Curated annotation (Swiss-Prot):
Cofactor comment text: Binds 1 zinc ion per subunit.
Protein name: Queuine tRNA-ribosyltransferase
Spans annotated as RNA binding: 245-251, 269-273
Family: Belongs to the queuine tRNA-ribosyltransferase family.
Cofactor list: Zn(2+)
The protein's annotated pathway: tRNA modification; tRNA-queuosine biosynthesis
InterPro entries xrefs: ArchSynthase1/Queuine_TRR, TGT, TGT-like_sf, tRNA_ribo_trans-like
Organism in which the protein naturally occurs: Citrobacter koseri (strain ATCC BAA-895 / CDC 4225-83 / SGSC4696)
Residues reported to bind substrate: D89, S90, G91, G92, F93, D143, Q187, G214
Length: 375
């Protein structure tokens, strides 16, 4: 992988990630394909929304279908027939999400398989091996996602262990002869001094890109913005910056304003299945009765298949009848909305008009622009 940085506007960056499998224009949003599918979508449909890279889930694909079945097909690209690049998370966040049924030690994480209850163990080395078999174009180190809230002492211990795991991840990744990209993950909760130590330690190990982890886990938005404002300038400018698990459209806008290049989140797909649709002027809750006889498109400014062909009334009808097509059409729209938003941000950065774009984005939704505390 090669990262090319074209231009900046304030702290916002316009660039691209270049892979053997294709080019990803940045800032970029990555749809999430947890089990080897972006829920309800074919790879061709995902590509038609404008997505150039997707995310796969190491933890879930390890449990089902497992490494051996994956290798029978080649790798994850062959298994799911996605031709572009794939980023896989390390499994750390999913293990964190297991709560009481897992035990974290210096060696790794002991837990029970949520499918059948069998005891199972995951460590940095195993995570690197699974992601190698998946053929991931971007591999994430195995870390502990520090919960929120966490006091300073706990956050420090967690961050320091994640640094040790980062070195183990790097060593095993190199030992496998993996020629793809490996990203480090910055931890430290909401504490700037801990984030400083994490960034410094990761840069000393050396990675192809750096993710900001441990955000969007319940902390106030002000804390997320503050940490991004503090951390992003410390990440080497020639490396991509990835904000993990984020988020709402406004979170993408605020991340870009602070220097983030990459995002992923289940929100556009999950919300689509619940009839919660993102449009230029905000949000449409399509199951509400007011849409029952509305013949207008979901978003007059959207060029997606759904908006070009169907009315709000039809989408409302499908949702009320629990028709599978409704979830699919909603997903197509939400994914396209996110890609249109990213394309708009990229164009605004190119033209040096980002703050004008941001102002218009919030004005259309009747909301104030959040403060930006950067030099």
């Amino acid at each position: 992988m090669k990262f090319e940085l074209d231009t900046t506007d304030g702290r916002a960056r316009r660039g691209r990630l270049v892979f053997d499998r294709g080019v990803v224009e940045t800032p970029a949003f990555m749809p999430v394909g947890t089990y080897g599918t972006v829920k309800g979508m074919t790879p061709e449909e995902v590509e038609a929304t404008g997505a150039q890279i997707i995310l796969g889930n190491t933890f879930h694909l390890w449990l089902r279908p497992g490494q051996e079945i994956m290798k029978l097909h080649g790798d994850l690209h062959d298994f799911m027939q996605w031709k572009g690049p794939i980023l896989t998370d390390s499994g750390g966040f999913q293990v964190f999400s297991l709560g009481d049924i897992r035990k974290i030690t210096e060696q790794g994480v002991h837990f029970r398989n949520p499918i059948n209850g069998d005891p199972i163990f995951l460590d940095p080395e195993k995570s690197m091996e699974i992601q190698y078999d998946l053929g991931s174009d971007i591999v994430m180190i195995f870390d502990e996602c520090t919960p929120y809230p966490a006091d300073w002492d706990y956050a420090k211990r967690s961050m320091e262990m994640s640094l040790r795991w980062a070195k183990r991840s790097r060593d095993r990744f190199d030992g496998l002869g993996n020629k793809n990209a490996l990203f480090g993950i910055i931890q430290g909760s909401v504490y700037e001094d801990l984030r400083d130590i994490s960034v410094k330690g990761l840069v000393e190990i050396g990675f192809d890109g750096y993710a900001v982890g441990g955000l969007a886990v319940g902390e106030p938005k002000e804390d997320m913005h503050r940490i991004l404002e503090h951390v992003c300038p410390q990440i080497p400018a020639d490396k991509p910056r990835y904000l993990m698990g984020v988020g709402k459209p406004e979170d993408l806008v605020e991340g870009v304003r602070r220097g983030i290049d990459m995002f992923d989140c289940v929100m556009p797909t999950r919300n689509a299945r619940n009839g919660h649709l993102f449009v230029t002027d905000g949000v449409v809750k399509i199951r509400n009765a007011k849409h029952k006889s509305d013949t207008s498109p979901l978003d007059a400014e959207c060029d997606c298949y759904t908006c070009r062909n169907y009315s709000r009334a039809y989408l409302h009808h499908l949702d009320r009848c629990n028709e599978i097509l409704g979830a699919r059409l909603n997903t197509i729209h939400n994914l396209r909305y996110y890609q249109r938003l990213m394309a708009g941000l990229r164009k605004a950065i190119e033209e040096g008009k980002l703050e004008s774009f941001v102002t218009d984005f919030y004005q259309r939704q009747g909301r104030p622009v959040p403060p930006l505390n950067v030099d």
